[in-house]
Every structure is written in C-alpha cells, then in structure tokens.
Regions:
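Serine-hydrolase catalytic core recognition
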Residues: 1-244
C-alpha cells in the first residue's frame, strides 16, 4: 500500500500474456473484517473468465482482513471502509504504474461487503476506476444487522463517524459519473443486505443527477441462487466487456 503496509495479493494474467502490451485490469475483492481471499486454493468465478478475454484480474486482501494477526485485523475497528478503500485504491494506482497495464482501463468489483467497497472506491477514486460493479452492497452501516456491525464497528453512539463517514449513501456527491461506469445489482428478497440499501443509494444518486446502471432481481436472495446465479454472472461479464 502507499503507506508502506505489506499486503497480500494474487494476479491472473492471460495465457498469451505479452509484457510489451497494455492490458485492462479488474480488481476483485471482498475486504471484510477477518476475511481472506488471497490463499492457496482454487475457486473460479465469473471474473476469472475475463482472463480468457485478455484481462488481468487482481485480488488484494487489505488491512482489516484475516490471517495476519489480531492487530492487523482490528485496524479497521470502528471505521469500516476507510483503510480498506485506501488499500484498494493504492492497489489500483500500483497497477496503473505497471508498463503492461492500460491505466485508463482499471475496474473494481465486489459482492456484499465487496459491493460496499466497490462503491466506496468508485466514489473516492476520483475517476481512477473506469468501471465499478457493486452486488448486494451495504450502503449504510445503519441499515445492516447489529450483531455484525456492532462487532466490527462498535456502537453507533460511540463511533458515529465510523457509521456515516464511509457509508456510500453519504458519498454520492463524490461520484464522477462522467468517467466511471457504475452497475449496482441487488435481489429484492435479500435477507442479509436488505434491498433498502440499494434503494437509498439510488435515491442519493438520483437526487444529485448522477447516471449509473442497475439490475434488480425480483424475489432473489443474497446469493441469487439458484434461479439467477447464471444470469447475474453473464450480466456482469457482458457489462465488463462493454465498459472496461
């Protein structure tokens, strides 16, 4: 990261990768407290298919994630979404400096906490990201369930800034819709991240006249399974190919 923290990540390159060429990059991330995506394992998803289309896919576990010790995990306590967004933006800037990357074609994607992060990065990125996809995103920690939120963000009376300063509904004014294409995806029957999150995000963006795209899945839950699992992934793949 730019402040010299060592972060763990992985990179997937096209099979015919040529360092003399410039490639678009998609950051895929979850970034939630105590989580881990960068590990020795194999679990391909839609974004990995982008590699066969000539994209580089990068994943970095930011500060606050797991398996780096208690101190590292607790860095984000009471302020969810600040350090993690800083680290993902730092990752994007690092990739933009690489000779084999097209700096004008960097995107970010995330689901759930990752969707919260994708919005935060799109809004705070100052046009760095050409595209962002946020699926089932938390848009205000005041809307999410207390057993999770209070565990990692403290009580709202004790940490009001942690609840509000990094919540995407309060950052819509920062969104540069002239340089970043944004897709928000949500199921109306999501009992984890309630659909209210996306509706309030839409209200904030609409009020400011911001342009974005949305895909709504009627009666679908947080995972979009089983009915729309394939549809949502094809939607995201096509959206990326068209906008990144």
């Amino acid at each position: 990261a730019e402040r010299c923290d060592e972060l763990r990540g992985y990179m997937l390159k096209p099979l015919d990768f040529d360092p003399a060429k410039r490639y678009p990059v998609l950051l895929t991330q979850y970034s939630g407290p105590g989580s881990q995506q960068v590990a020795e394992g194999w679990g391909p998803d839609w974004e990995d298919a982008l590699v066969t289309h000539g994209y580089i896919v990068v994943c970095v576990d930011p500060r606050g994630t797991g398996y780096r010790g208690e101190e590292f995990k607790k860095l984000t306590y009471g302020n969810l979404g600040r350090l993690e967004v800083e680290d993902q933006i730092s990752t994007a800037r690092y990739m933009a400096r690489q000779s084999y990357v097209d700096p004008a074609r960097i995107g970010i994607y995330g689901w759930s906490y990752g969707g919260f992060m994708a919005l935060g990065c799109a809004f705070r990125g100052e046009g760095l990201f050409k595209m962002a996809i946020a699926v089932a995103p938390v848009t205000s920690w005041r809307y999410y369930d207390s057993i999770y939120t209070e565990n990692f963000n403290g009580l709202p009376d004790d940490y009001p800034k942690g609840y509000d300063d990094n919540s995407p509904v309060n950052l819509a004014h920062l969104f540069r819709d002239d340089s970043t294409r944004l897709l928000i995806v949500h199921g109306t029957a999501d009992d984890n991240v309630h659909f209210q999150n996306t509706m309030e995000m839409a209200r904030a963006l609409n009020k400011l006249g911001k342009q974005y795209d949305m895909m709504v899945y009627p009666d679908q839950n947080h995972s979009m399974m089983p009915d729309d699992m394939i549809h949502v992934r094809e939607k995201m793949l096509r959206y990326t190919l068209e906008n990144l």
